[in-house]
Amino acid sequence: MNKQRGTYSEVSLAQDPKRQQRKLKGNKISISGTKQEIFQVELNLQNASSDHQGNDKTYHCKGLLPPPEKLTAEVLGIICIVLMATVLKTIVLIPCIGVLEQNNFSLNRRMQKARHCGHCPEEWITYSNSCYYIGKERRTWEERVCWPVLRRTLICFL
């Protein structure tokens, strides 16, 4: 294991910077300046390669989360995405449902207005000078084919 030694130095101004004069020995020059403090810290550094030998499950970087926290973060992220998708889907679909309901309402009003023309049988709808019957009854195929023939009408399936 290689050990390396390093020194960290920091120079900062003192809390109460007062002007002071210093006379150098042997010179007649005076130096005016602010009071400064110097901090030195000695650091012992080890080779990073020696730390990585052996146990790969240790975490040497601060940015990596241990597995339980990482798993929790992933689950919460997925839940957040699902909730956002649900909210967006709701925002988009609610106006569409409202438009469909309005269209259905206006279609029902037109059908009610069309019924009051007079020349079509009761429960029939007049549209473009023709009469139409929209049935909701359940009938067999033979009954559906014979029913319009008996009334001298044409059958149309949509």
Swiss-Prot record:
Keyword set, alphabetical order: Disulfide bond, Membrane, Receptor, Signal-anchor, Transmembrane, Transmembrane helix
GO biological process annotation, one example: positive regulation of natural killer cell mediated cytotoxicity
Q: What does UniProt note about where in the body, tissue by tissue, this protein is expressed?
A: Natural killer cells.
Compositional bias of type Polar residues: which residue ranges?
1-12
| Main location as per UniProt | membrane
Role, per record: May play a role as a receptor for the recognition of MHC class I HLA-E molecules by NK cells.
| Molecular-function annotations in GO | transmembrane signaling receptor activity
The gene that this protein is the product of is: KLRC4
* Originating organism: Homo sapiens
The protein in question is named NKG2-F type II integral membrane protein
Q: Where do transmembrane segments lie in this chain? A: 75-95
- Record topology, Cytoplasmic segments: 1-74
Membrane topology is: Single-pass type II membrane protein
